[in-house]
Amino acid sequence: MDRPICPPKIAIIGAGIGGLALAIGLTRRNVDYTIYEAGSQFSAVGAGIALGPNSLRAMTLIDPRLMELYKGISRGNRSPEKAHIFADFMLAEPGFGINSGWEGAPVGSKDFTKSGAHRKDLLDIMTRLFPTENVRFGKRAVEVRQAGQKVVIQFADGEAVEVDAVIGCDGAKGATRRAVLTENYPDHVAARYSGRYVYRVVIPATEAQQALGAYADDGKMFLGPGHYFALYQMSGGRLNLVAGRQKNDEWTHDQWTQDVTREEMLADFKGCDPRLIELLGVSIPYISLWLETEIVIS
């Protein structure tokens, strides 16, 4: 008599966008799994997300319903003729380059429609497409190790679980990264500062238009030596602003975010167009400084 085939036990570590996208795909294909999430609930931390053509295609492949729900929360460029433009690339100098004889360059494709959403709104629609009872909250993985043909996950609360496969969606500081890289690439386990940090904020569309006028209607990238501003539409009548600074120095702080004064922030963009400085000004006190690393992990 043949033994019954037991379905594999699959663990997903992390309930962010990557982990939930995987859960949706596995659910659609009737594959059982458990998500282990360190937080006590789905996180609302984050700002805007602009999705490129590969991400949009992936949504449909994961589950066509995900794309349909995303269309309901996402927002694109306001100008119909710029629907397929990812961003107008302009200069951050006074006049946005027009005074220098360069009026910018649109970057996009007829096969791509620009869109963006708030991270929380995206997570909210994703949780509709899989059984949330598959998520165990308050489970911070501290170690992932191979044990013969199985994998053992050790959690901070003392519990250990044995599974057939682990898919890590727990980020640059996660236990999965250490498990994969420590033996052969120990120098690459810790995240390394790229020399760039960013300020990011969600701004009401009315305030962005007061500062920038029609320039706030569509996706923009304002570039300058050692700095840039990225601006795009997202859900809820808001815009996402990311202001980046490249200094190539050392990050000496313990945390990945750092409080700064208004004066310190504005000094980072001295010499830029006054409208961009005004836009930064209306964001106070909601703006935070975040470092950027050389690591991209689901």
Task: Name what the model sees in each region.
Residues 2-18:
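Beta1/beta-strand and adjacent pyrophosphate-binding region of the FAD-binding site
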Residues 66-67, 111-284:
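Conserved FAD-binding catalytic core of PHBH/FMO-like flavoproteins
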Residues 291-298:
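FAD-binding beta-loop-beta segment adjacent to the flavin cofactor pocket
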Residues 10-12, 20-22, 29, 141:
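A generic "structured core" feature
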Residues 27-47:
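Glycine-rich FAD pyrophosphate-binding loop
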Residues 9, 32, 238:
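Residues at the starts of beta-strands that form the adenosine-phosphate
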Residues 18, 41, 173:
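Conserved Rossmann-like nucleotide-cofactor binding loop
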Residues 46-129:
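Active-site-adjacent segment of FAD-dependent monooxygenases/related oxidoreductases
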